[in-house]
């Protein structure tokens, strides 16, 4: 694993993995075979966060462990990914992709390292969550730009350090479903900026706001701006990552 930005002569990092639908029983029924078929898909979709997790090893081989502390990625999801398919992930300098065996894109994005002079990110205030049975149904009336989201807290648990980026991004999904009733819905892409290293076992707090709402080809999209924070050794709340999470809440 390298410890600096990739050089011109550094070969691309390529990994292969068999896709696994990690959320067939989730509240988001786009991952359920029967529901997904009704929306024109072959079967339940492998979560976009899982596809992102498949790309992380290639990113780390190119950029090194430092990327976990101050790395960034902006990616979009393209073709649906299904259980059992072979996913080929490649990071060649700043370009990262996840493809099927025919070379069609599941996801593509750009990777970078943050400059230390970028300054402290915006800190989002904490708000209470709605009660589970009083969550509003996601709609053009309830999903509005500027709406603060109720905050979530939980312990960071990842199988290994390289799984932490996927786990952090999964919290973006979690804060949405803790604030709204949305099903089915689809993750469309994310921009992630790591600010410092998150560690297994830390209590993570996620806060944010609905930043933007728009419609494209009859589908309703929204963008959530999120801050993921921990308490440091001095007890101060500090941001470990910021996320702009784009999703389709009405298919």
Language model features with spans:
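Structured core of small recognition/catalytic domains
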Residues: 159-229
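HotDog/MaoC-like acyl-thioester-processing domains
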Residues: 1-19, 77-140, 197-251
